[in-house]
A protein has these predicted regions:
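The feature primarily captures lumenal catalytic ectodomains
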Residues: 1-178
Length: 178
């Protein structure tokens, strides 16, 4: 982990975003194209109305942001969540330490659990980040077109309550005790 911490620190300094003790913020990664949350608007509204999450969760489409802005979001957070995909690589940049827990939630499209690689679980372990995983059902627009193949579509319909409960557990973990 020491090499990863040095790398994370160097990148943070390069972008001018290195934080010593970021807030208990959670960045939820949204996607465009494949593996989107089809009920994203409802889910975001539910998070906004959830007193456990509304003040700490921010949503971002990383592919629409400059790299420095992406780095600033993550360096100012303690947790990251999203549907399986390369945006979760930012898990390596969460400022985890023995006295500063961080967390990652990887949402797998149904059918992905056995064939999805363990990259983000392994990356979390290397960075001492608590790894969490949820499986969510493929959206109807995938099932009709691709016979339930997450590789061809991968769009999901999230169970808002289930995902929000997991996010709340993560926020509780990363929130400093008073």
């Amino acid at each position: 982990q020491a090499q990863l911490v040095r790398f994370r620190t160097t990148v943070g300094v390069s972008f001018g975003v290195a934080r010593q003790n970021p807030a208990a913020r959670l960045v939820f990664l949204l996607r465009s194209g494949n593996r989107v949350i089809v009920n994203e608007n409802v889910f975001q509204a539910d998070v906004a109305n959830d007193s456990r999450l509304s003040s700490v969760v921010s949503f971002a489409r990383m592919e629409e942001l400059p790299l420095a802005t992406q780095a600033a979001l993550i360096y100012d957070a303690r947790a990251i969540a999203g549907v399986h995909g390369q945006g979760l690589t930012w898990t390596a940049f969460l400022p985890a330490a023995d006295d500063r827990p961080c967390a990652c939630l990887e949402i797998h499209p149904e059918g992905c659990s056995h064939s999805c690689k363990s990259d983000y679980r392994d990356l979390s372990a290397m960075n001492k980040v608590q790894y969490n995983r949820l499986v969510q059902p493929l959206a109807n627009n995938c099932i009709a077109k691709y016979a339930a193949s997450w590789r061809m579509c991968g769009n999901i319909t999230v169970n808002s309550e289930q995902v929000r409960d997991k996010l709340a557990q993560m926020v509780a973990l990363v929130t400093p005790r008073q």
